A protein has these predicted regions:
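Anionic-ligand binding patches
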Residues: 1-127
Length: 127
């Protein structure tokens, strides 16, 4: 199964809630049987520069899908995703700080911030 962009928000139907999407995903995984339940979240950020150039950053986190939802924090598929880089908690069980430290969005934003910092040498000299 592959979810892309806004389609993941409507996976269980046009009016589905986050919980509906998680339940639907788990039911689909049960239907296809046992096997690896690996998953990954990815985010790309592009910054258009005044000179026509672009900066492109990507963040990714790999993990597994749980058998049942766990936790009440976060949003979307957070209750069913356990990142490989974590402590065995789902994203929904983590504090926001712990999640953002390893999330795909956090990684992409940190990578973009580094690229912007390197692309703007005048900003470094004003500190």
């Amino acid at each position: 199964m592959l979810f892309r962009s806004v389609f993941s928000a409507r996976y269980a139907g046009p009016d589905a809630t986050y919980a509906d999407n998680c339940v639907h995903l788990l039911a689909e995984l049960d239907r296809v049987g046992s096997g690896p339940r690996t998953a990954r979240f990815a985010t790309s950020i592009v910054l258009a520069l005044p000179d026509g150039g672009e900066l492109d950053a990507r963040g990714e986190v790999v993990g597994v899908i749980t058998d049942v939802p766990r936790g009440s924090g976060g949003f979307g598929y957070d209750p069913v995703f356990v990142p490989d880089d974590g402590d065995g908690s789902t994203f929904a069980e983590m504090t926001p700080e712990a999640k953002h430290a390893i999330s795909h969005r956090g990684r992409a934003l940190r990578a973009m911030a580094e690229m912007v910092w390197e692309a703007l040498p005048t900003a470094r000299t004003q500190e």
